């Protein structure tokens, strides 16, 4: 059995830049997604106890769904609203991975609402970040489910 001191020494040590990909971030100036990305990169660096490659970010369609491109981890940019379904499949096949779903209010609650509900019903170990920008950022013709007033 490995003594506790050895386990601490074998734990990977990361800094925020270890989770920053080389991709140019393509969000509008002032977008709140920048803050979410920065906090996630810093949080994973501070608290992860596993290899960086064991984190997977899965997204659908929308502004926030470009997230996997900006994380230096594995990731999928999937089809509109289906990220929870794909994440469920991945977690079932590879339960050792830390699987994150990043989705927006339109992607995750409009077209993907049923997939989100079923992922929660299945109660598997997914981590879901739902970004609520309260605007139809990608499709300006539709209101999303969390919009409090008509725009």
Where are each of the predicted segments found?
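Short capping/connector residues at structural and topological boundaries
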Residues: 32, 114, 141-143
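Flexible, glycine/proline-enriched loop segments at strand-loop-helix junctions
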Residues: 26-30, 102-106, 151
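Active-site diphosphate/adenylate-binding microenvironment
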Residues: 11-13, 17-79
């Amino acid at each position: 059995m490995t003594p506790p001191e050895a386990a601490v020494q074998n734990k990977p040590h990361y800094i925020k830049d270890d989770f920053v990909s080389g991709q140019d971030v393509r969000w509008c100036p002032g977008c709140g997604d920048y803050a979410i990305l920065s906090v996630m990169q810093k949080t994973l660096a501070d608290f992860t106890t596993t290899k960086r490659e064991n984190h997977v970010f899965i997204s659908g369609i929308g502004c926030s769904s470009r997230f996997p491109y900006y994380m230096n981890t594995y990731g999928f940019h999937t089809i509109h609203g289906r990220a929870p379904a794909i994440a469920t499949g991945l977690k079932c096949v590879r339960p050792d991975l830390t699987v994150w779903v990043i989705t927006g209010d339109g992607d995750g609650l409009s077209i993907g609402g049923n997939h989100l509900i079923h992922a929660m019903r299945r109660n598997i170990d997914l981590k879901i970040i739902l970004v609520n920008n309260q605007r139809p950022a990608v499709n300006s013709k539709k209101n999303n489910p969390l919009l409090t007033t008509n725009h």
